[in-house]
Amino acid sequence: MTKYYIVTLLLLFGVTNKAQAQFGFSHEIGGIMGPVAFQSDYGERNDISTNAGNTGFGIGLIHYLNFSYKAECNCYTPETYFNDHFKLRSELSYNKTELQHFGKWVDKSRTSLIANQLRGMRGSTSVTNIGMQLEYFPLSIRDFTSTIGSWAPFVSLGGQFSFYDPEAYSTLGELDTPLTTPVKYLGATTNQGGTVWSIVSSIGTRYKLTELSDLMVDLRVQYYFSNWVDGLNPDPKVYLENRANDWNVW
């Protein structure tokens, strides 16, 4: 089954912390939570039920280095374009998604062996991420910081290192046998966890609630350099619709 893009939102609530900071920069800390649409080898392309059904949940902690403000003197840093338009974000997050096949190939009207096997396939994956992103704010960070009720749109790009733990099974019996598993997935399943690098990119905006707190809405795409994160990996040379690696949208 192929991957299909879905738009979901990640809500973040961040509280800045003007404590003494290493290198003189101020720190911001916050928590993130929101739905995770996992694009995997489960489901069908261009199918709404696939995108809605294979959606999990993610939570995490984030930390920012704010280059525009010096914590030790409660004053601004020297005014440069970089200091006033960039922040460095580090993150520790966790997400889990329950997975199964959706779409016309598993419709109740289909009674073939393959349809029954697809309906019986189940899976899940848990992913723990740690990494960093560089966020770019086209508007002035200083102006945003000093103005309650203001907005600060941004884009970001970075990388993460992830620990994943997949589970694949069948309600019909032991997986990876001709009785329970479609030919496409024979020898292409695993319950073994692993590690993987990924690229992360996001677009969003902050809203200034108070002097020390922001609310952020963030749309993030994470692309893994592996097709095993979901526990399935059909031969991409034979099944071209499955040639893309796993990815998700927060």
Where are these regions (language model features)?
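Short glycine/proline- and aromatic-enriched beta-strand/turn motifs that initiate or cap beta-hairpins
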Residues: 21-72
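Structural signature of outer-membrane beta-barrel domains
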Residues: 34-40, 66-68, 93-99, 160-166, ...
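Extracellular loop and loop/strand-boundary signature of outer-membrane beta-barrel proteins
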Residues: 41-49, 115-123, 143, 183-191, ...
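Residues on the lipid-exposed face of transmembrane beta-strands in outer-membrane beta-barrel proteins
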Residues: 31-35, 59-65, 71, 132-138, ...
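Short loop/turn motifs that connect adjacent beta-strands in outer-membrane beta-barrel proteins
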Residues: 21-25, 66-85, 124, 140-152, ...
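Residues that define the transmembrane beta-barrel architecture of outer-membrane proteins
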Residues: 25, 51-57, 84, 126-130, ...
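Predominantly the C-terminal beta-signal and adjacent terminal strand-loop region
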Residues: 24, 40-44, 49, 206-250
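Flexible, surface-exposed loop regions and adjacent strand-edge segments
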Residues: 46-50, 104-112, 171-178, 232-240
